[in-house]
Amino acid sequence: MSVVVQHVEEKAVHSWSRISTAGKKALEEALLVFNPMSQDLSATEAQLVAFLQGLRDDGFQPTILRSGDVYGYSSCTANPPSQTKLQARAPTPAATSPPASAPQTAVRLPAGRATLLPMPLSGRLAKASTPGLAKHATTNLLLSSLKQSSAGRAQGAAVGFPTHLYPGVYPAMRLSVVLEALVPIKTPVACLGAKPKAQSLQLSLGDSPLKVRKGPGKRLGNAQLKAPRKATSKGSKCLAQRGPRSGPRQGAGLQSKTCKVTGSLGGPRVKDGGALGTKAAQAKAACAQAKVAQTQATATQARAKAKAVRARAKAKAARIKAREVRARAKAKAVQAKAKVARTQPRGRGRPKGSIQGRTARRSRKSRPETVGQKRKRTEEAKDLSPRKRTRLGPRSPKVQLGPGTARLLKFRAIKVDRLASDDEVRQQAQRILRVNLSPVIRLQPLPPHSAP
């Protein structure tokens, strides 16, 4: 895992990732992003290197941010950068901001502190040090203290970088801290060139409150506390010009003049502006209430319209359902009438048992009987006694059932008991099937429990 001087093996991440805690954490996160199911991070790093090499072979040019590009110093050493390197890397003071001073010991960034950096540092400083002041005033004090510390290090009493406000910041990252503090400032660079003196304002890094001297200069602090939250360009210039002035009388005179010109600090103008602001706020609140009432009325109308549409749809569905019920009832009545018409006989007042005679008469008309068939039917009628004839008569299913079910009579079973003879069974089968059966019939005995 050590760095090879001859560059025989290329590493995806340089040696700073193996020296500092934050670097190790960043390397592990990068490897886990490349292969989330990895069990061996060394093998995953080799896979990452091979993947990048394959991209180079295919013609792509992957850009790898080195730690020197990010933090401003070489990654092959754990020593913090010297003051000359920082001054060489930092831009000129007239362009953006002065270079920051580096302490003797390097501060390591823990893994959990990395999430604090995207938040604006000037806002955090304003909340931690002076909550009553506006943000632009705190930012001006921060930049003034940084410029004083960089320009006057020979005095010995210069204020250093506020490390207690940024506990996890690298030495080389303080340049980015200064650039981040420059964002909310709207004043030109010329207003920041003067050095603030300790007579008007003092910034103590131990307690981090803003101390103001007693006397007439106290009105200067009150004016800063009473300043409106929304800072205009004129208000920012007023605060920036008033800071470097020495002496309480000059600050008070400047305050009275600027109050007459701008009308944004102290005095009766503040009351007038407050009244106007209150009226504007009341008018805005009234407009908002009117909008809310209009929105509620529109919503009520929409709900009423939707309710009416639902009621009409429900009534229409009920009418359609009633129509369908009537149609079904009518169809059912028609079917019942047709069924009754099918089951009733078509004869003119003949009894129910006349179907057999009518069928026999029709067959007699279509085909004349022979002499042998007449004699056979007469003999069968003589053989039967009157008692048996009456007993076997109602048993004929042809007489009891209508013409619709006459086709199913060949599947009808003939029940035989002890009193029935073979001739009776044969005659009953002949009546049902209307065929001349042979006199040989195979009979099976009934079960003992069904016998009478």
Curated annotation (Swiss-Prot):
Assigned keywords, A-Z: Coiled coil, Phosphoprotein
Regions annotated as coiled coil: 279-344
InterPro entries: Ccdc71/71L
Record-listed Phosphoserine modification sites: S129
Protein's name according to its UniProt entry: Coiled-coil domain-containing protein 71
Keyword flag Nucleus: no
A Pfam cross-reference name: CCDC71L
Transmembrane regions listed in the UniProt entry: none
Disordered as annotated region, ranges: 81-106, 209-256, 322-404
Biased composition (Basic and acidic residues): 377-386
Entry superkingdom: Eukaryota
Biased composition (Low complexity): 87-106, 332-344
Species: Bos taurus
